Amino acid sequence: MVKVVLLAGGGGHTGYAYSLAQHLSGKCELEAFYPQNDELSYKRLSKYADTKALVLPRGPKTGMGPFLKGLARSFLQSSKLLKGKYVIVSTGNNFCIPPSLISWTKSNPIVSLEASVRFVGPSKTANILKRFAKVIALHWEEQKKIFPQGEVFGPIIAEPAVKSHNDGYVLVTGGTYGHSGLLKSLDSLDLENVVVQSGPHNLEKLKEKHPTWNIFGWSDKFHEILAGADVVVTASGSTVLESAIVYKKPTIISYNPEWTRTAKYEDILMLSKKVNGILLETFNHNSLMDAIEKARKQKPPEIKSGAGKLSKRILELAEEL
């Protein structure tokens, strides 16, 4: 049986890998690498693949010294863990660079997936891997301006975990690393039914002020929570696609100027237009309430997932080995 290795760098990157794993499972020998200590990625991917932990060289606040040490460790681990002939799939993030390059030295083809939020310029990982990748996979036609040699498959999104329904709550998610500006603005929000995914932030004071709210850090049942929301307020990761396209939720995308290593303002603006979402630029009670009302009036987009199409392309490459 042919072999495929998925690289899941956490958060939305794991979301892409999870979406592909749903289609690849049972059709190939499937391995998935995830960042050490990332229990959420492990729980999601272990349903479909043989999972292996690998060091994540750099997080949002990692300095250059620790980054270089982590990079060296990742190259060493990758050279020991990756064996045989296979297709390796990078879903973005610096996590994917060492195992991808080690695979290239072993003449194993790389599929490099660009992030769905990139419209103006490439991500660092995709830009590095473009010289080595057999296939550069894109979500949108507009991304051909960044990678003319890329292949467009459509947005890489998972099959719905449960049927979409409306339990009446506003879901606010700060993403994998949290969104301090957005989360601070919730303090004055005068709503009874709110669910908050806080990420690494401690929101004990917010819990005390809003005892009716459901506040949690992370959950492997997140998709069930997403499916029951009335409106979703989220960062610019893959939750945008899942909320607007998979579960047809009114979606608000919150721009985070603190994330200097991620997408630019123009990227977030274009993504919000693609999914008929509302872009949230300022974080206070009035702007948030106004965005919620505007989002409820938006019609969800009709866009097909590209996960099945990309999975088929990956298997075709594997058959050629």
Named regions from a protein language model:
Residues 1-321:
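Nucleotide-activated sugar donor-binding and catalytic core shared by glycosyltransferases
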